[in-house]
Amino acid sequence: MSDDILFVSNGNGKAIFLTSRAVLVKSFCSLSKTCSFKDSCQSCEIVDAAKSYLMGKKSDLNVKSLDGELSAGIGEYKIGKNVLLKVMGLGSCIGVILSDVSTGICGIAHVLLPGASNSGEAKYAETAIENMFEDMIRMGARKNRITAKFAGGAQVFKHMSLDILKIGDRNAISVEETLVKRNIPILAKDVGGEVGRNVIFNPVDGSMIVKYTKGEVLWL
């Protein structure tokens, strides 16, 4: 777990920085595809702003500190306020994010299977979304302000043609149908394909960061 998690933005881009003992140890930057300094992170005002914050100095850029991070394992959902949310190692699973940016309350579910569970198991799409939604409202989120983003649903059995094996597609359909039924606006999604994903959510601006196992990073 990082000592500090920072979100820094300017007119051109934005980045999440994970730190340890006031040192930048990892970053996710929206400019990574076009950045001339991605190997050395030199001459970057976004990096400079993060370093200045860690040294207690003021910056002209927008710098926000998050209150920790939460990671949902398979069949789990996690809820927090002003925290970085993560689901890692998604194949056919779906990472579902619900958030109320006005309060900073957000949740993330690691959905394993489509449909609902009679016993309330959060590994099922409908059950996870319903329970997470209600728990967020109890925590103080505003029902009419909650929005959704989700990613995952890869076709891990790419050589199989049987529909029953297309669990990624079925998961994505189940997630979307549940959100529509709940009247939760879907702001972004990234589903399908044959590649695994890690998903990170930043509650400050509502960004979903999708990192493919092949290295590509999307900010949605």
Swiss-Prot record:
For this entry, list what GO says about its biological process: chemotaxis
Q: Which UniProt keywords apply?
A: Chemotaxis, Hydrolase
Q: What is its EC number?
A: 3.5.1.44
Q: Which reaction is catalysed here?
A: L-glutaminyl-[protein] + H2O = L-glutamyl-[protein] + NH4(+)
CDD domains given in the database record: CheD (cd16352)
Query: In this record, what's one Pfam family?
Result: CheD
Highest taxon, organism lineage: Archaea
Protein's UniProt keywords contain Hydrolase: yes
Q: Name one GO molecular function term.
A: protein-glutamine glutaminase activity
Q: Which cysteines are joined by disulfide bonds?
A: none
Family designation: Belongs to the CheD family.
Q: What does this protein do?
A: Probably deamidates glutamine residues to glutamate on methyl-accepting chemotaxis receptors (MCPs), playing an important role in chemotaxis.
The protein in question is named Probable chemoreceptor glutamine deamidase CheD 2
Native source organism of the sequence:
Methanosarcina acetivorans (strain ATCC 35395 / DSM 2834 / JCM 12185 / C2A)
What is the name of the gene encoding this protein? cheD2
